[in-house]
């Protein structure tokens, strides 16, 4: 908003190029493992933990993007935030994601299930609070910070679980499926959010997204967590 979309894309492109150069020069070359064949896919999809994790991912991503896709007009029309404050809010949202990644590194190994439960639950809590928080910029910032932190933290934690519970020759494919389903959630959530905006109104996107994410949390607690406890790490 502050510098325009062209400059935004230019900055993102420059940062992405810098990240590629950094990875190419700093990280060591990794030997290629065994090739994954199409015949291994049915076996991968028989893993109950992966299926549960994938299902939770779809619901969480759908709920997230039912709201996030329309956060800018929500802030402008419902929270009555001006352009500079919207930029500040979205920046705080992004920075809170960095906090979520840091918390993952510090806490996940020693507090696995509490970490997953808290970060997963934080997403629908934040979404459901969007409407009530819209009366004040301070509360909007707090809700967006909670939202961004928890969303990033559970996303990274899910990827760690995928790597831990899939063979080395299958982990890349398992991760690709995860990414594909997350993108499915993005598209589905955006469509649902658009229907909410066209119907009840943009003030309701947080409630719609939160309700969907609650389903994801319930699935995680009742299906995914027991599957994780039963599974034996293979990586």
Predicted regions and their residues:
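Intracellular juxtamembrane helix-capping segments at the cytosolic ends
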Residues: 153-167
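A late C-terminal transmembrane helix in Major Facilitator Superfamily
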Residues: 165-202, 208-209
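A membrane-interface helix-boundary motif in multi-pass transporters
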Residues: 1-13, 195-214
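Structural signature of the two symmetry-related core transmembrane helices
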Residues: 13, 114-129, 210
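C-terminal membrane-cytosol helix-exit motif in multi-pass small-molecule transporters
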Residues: 8, 13-33, 219-224
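Helix-to-loop junctions at the C-terminal end of transmembrane segments
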Residues: 99-112, 197
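Juxtamembrane intracellular "pre-TM" segments in multi-pass secondary transporters
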Residues: 26-54
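Extracytoplasmic gate region of multi-pass secondary transporters
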Residues: 49-91, 95-98, 112
């Amino acid at each position: 908003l502050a510098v325009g979309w062209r400059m935004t894309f230019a900055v993102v492109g420059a940062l992405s190029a810098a990240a590629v150069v950094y990875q190419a020069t700093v990280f060591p070359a990794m030997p290629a493992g065994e090739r994954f064949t199409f015949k291994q896919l049915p076996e991968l999809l028989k893993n109950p933990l992966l299926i549960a994790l994938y299902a939770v991912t779809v619901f969480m991503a759908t709920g997230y993007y039912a709201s996030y896709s329309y956060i800018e007009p929500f802030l402008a029309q419902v929270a009555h935030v001006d352009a500079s404050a919207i930029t500040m809010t979205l920046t705080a949202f992004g920075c809170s994601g960095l906090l979520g990644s840091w918390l993952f590194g510090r806490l996940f190994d020693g507090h696995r299930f509490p970490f997953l439960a808290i970060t997963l639950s934080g997403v629908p809590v934040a979404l459901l609070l969007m409407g009530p928080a819209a009366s004040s910029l301070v509360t909007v910032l707090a809700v967006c910070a909670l939202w961004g932190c928890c969303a990033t933290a559970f996303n990274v934690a899910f990827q760690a679980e995928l790597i831990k519970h899939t063979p080395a020759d299958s982990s890349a494919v398992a991760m690709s499926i995860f990414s594909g389903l997350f993108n499915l959630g993005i598209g589905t959530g955006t469509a649902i959010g658009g229907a909410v905006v066209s119907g009840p109104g943009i003030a309701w996107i947080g409630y719609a997204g939160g309700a969907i994410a609650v389903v994801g949390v319930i699935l995680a607690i009742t299906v995914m967590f027991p599957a994780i406890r039963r599974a034996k790490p293979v990586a």
